[in-house]
Amino acid sequence: MKELYTDLAVVGGGPAGVCAALEAARLGLEVVLIQNRPVLGGSSSSEIRVWTRGAVGAGNLFSEEMGVLGALKKRNLYTNPDGTPLFWDDVLLDAVTSQPGLTLLLNTDVTEVEVQDRRLLWVQGSQQASERTWRVHAKMFIDATGDGSVGARAGVPYWIGEHLFRKDAAPEPTALLGSSILYYVKKEDHPVAFVPPSYAYSLEDVEAPLGRGGRIVSETQSGSDCWWFEYGGLRNTIADAQDIAFELRRIVMGIWNYIKNSGRFNAACYTLEWVGSLPGKRESRRMDTAYLLSQEDVLRHTDFADGGFYGGWYMDFHPAEGIGSDEDNCTQIPVNVYAVPLRCLYHADFPNLLFAGRNIGTRREAFVSTRVMNTCGLSGQAAAALAWGCLRWGKSPAALAPEEVERIRQTLLREDMFLPGLSNQDPEDLARDAAVTASSRYQPEEGPAAGWFSLEQGGFVACPCPDEPRGRFLVRADAPATLQAVWHCCPLPSRLCPGQPAGKQSWQLTAGENWLDALFPSQAQGQYGMLVFDPAPGVSLALAERRAPGILCGRADAPEYRDPLFLPGKNSFYAPENVVDGCSRVWRQPHLWCSAPEAAPWLELRWDTPRTFDTILLYLDPELSMEIPSSRTDHWEDHHRFAARKGMPPQLMRDVSVQALTENGWRTVARCTGNWRRLLELSAGEAVTATALRLVREKTWGDERAHLFEVRVYRQHR
């Protein structure tokens, strides 16, 4: 037997476990990450190949998940722009194995735990192939297994469906979300025969459910298009996992046989390139934690004093009968971004065990939203920060004082977690009391249209309410017409949940181009205004040559957003001082500095007295309204409402330098080239004493301007 002693043991190597382990190690803890598979990534790995999705995929603008998960996704976009699942595995493995203070145990299945007075002492598992048994002793543990297996073995009560179970209780039959196996297809330049295995379902069995509830197959569907190949929701998704996997294999091979050999498809040259051997599991245990997130919390966006991360995926219900159901293959209720409290990550009676991933504490109606992998990754980062706080102050999570919880939240905010409504209050951040100036500031200008966006099917413009609550926009009409719209107000816009209605506005159009006034309602003050247009055949909205950050247009049914020629009234949207206003993302306002187009825009922080620092944190603009999935196929069905990125975000800073005004004059103290990160940490290499600091944007990935949400300056950051 091999034994390890550590600060934190994380069990489970999916997005939640990987993010938990990386965050904890970044915060200075010694960490052991235990994964029962040969690769990291869980359902997003090359073994299962479900793509990671979250708030943006469900229609929320400016809400792509960042933090630790965001850094991994950005690295994947940089090194693996085609979204190949194998390379996503390596992005995760590279991050984990290169992180100081982090030990990785692959192929190690934890089957035993030791508990004393409800405190975990160790977890133990066998490692495949090495014939080793590992026992890991830790001060804190995070169960990121998905199934909540560590918590269940430790005696933590848990939920399955609507039923609460305690240790050793036999689960009752219940209706759950099923599991799925995916496949990838490939088109060859010659016919490829397919002879089905004997276990595959017959053509007649496969044909029976097709066409019901949106279950339509084609020869081109591939990867996550196959999500509705679903089974197991009426079985025990843990105890019957192997039977479920084989049944899914029968279904998948039967469907492919139907595509190849029924004569209904142009599939002669198509073949299977890959078939999953492991199902992607959607639902099993949910732990009974100090607080259970509810449907009401999701729909009403409850403001929690201990909010630790956020969600934004649909309330996404699937019939338990899966592919055999007569119901729609899913019912998706869109929601706005909502907070999840840290109390969902622990049971008050178990002082050193935390949870992350789909096994956190929620009511089932909330679980169908929190279960997706982007949200799971954020929960892992939050659990790691909570573990760090517990070890720092020597307390259980339930015993933390309000000011200690707030310190954990501020730490998460610094580590690029978006906590809706929370602003930077870090007393160690020297940038907060600096005066800020810049070389320039961007102002949208009136000009000719760079293109046109049809309003035939309606559409929207999302813009934060300016200080002068009005704006101007250009439309073109083929003939005289009436254009009508409804105003909505919200802190963060969504194409599917535009917010509270706040009045109507209409315009009489003449044939040709018309400049129109948009009058923001009083309810929009301090919020976003969403101007939602009724369908207007023959009317188009003018598009701008350059994006005005924080202002977008689009349609409710489409994930592609455009840049309207919309001129807001007097505002401070892109002012230099926004970089120290405490917000590093869009929330009610853009909260960023955007320069005018120029060769080397700069931003300067200046203090009344000299300050000593060694670290500068820059929170950059990676285009937060576009998804960065872990992987994707060359083809995806329209119902996913997914828009693929074409390369790196043009507004992201690529090359940047930092200069300091010391007693000997200006000198460069830090520089980065080829940046791909959203949170860019620059080290001066030594303590620098200066009265001013200047950031110079040398190059972006395409934009002529500089985009910057926030600057932080620290002495001895870590």
Outline where the language-model segments fall.
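Beta1/beta-strand and adjacent pyrophosphate-binding region of the FAD-binding site
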Residues: 2-14
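Conserved N-terminal/central alpha/beta ligand/cofactor-binding core
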Residues: 5, 23, 29-30, 34-112, ...
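N-terminal Rossmann-fold NAD(P) dinucleotide-binding loop
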Residues: 17
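Flavin (FAD/FMN)-binding glycine-rich loop and adjacent Rossmann-like elements that form
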Residues: 43, 122, 128-140, 144-455, ...
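Short, well-structured beta-strand segments enriched in hydrophobic/aromatic residues
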Residues: 153, 471-473, 516-551, 696
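Aromatic, loop-rich ligand-recognition surfaces of beta-strand-rich domains
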Residues: 460-462, 466-497, 586-668, 674-718
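Extracellular carbohydrate recognition and processing domains
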Residues: 498-522, 667-684
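Exposed low-complexity, polar/acidic, P/S/T/G-rich flexible segments that act as propeptides
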Residues: 536-586, 702-718
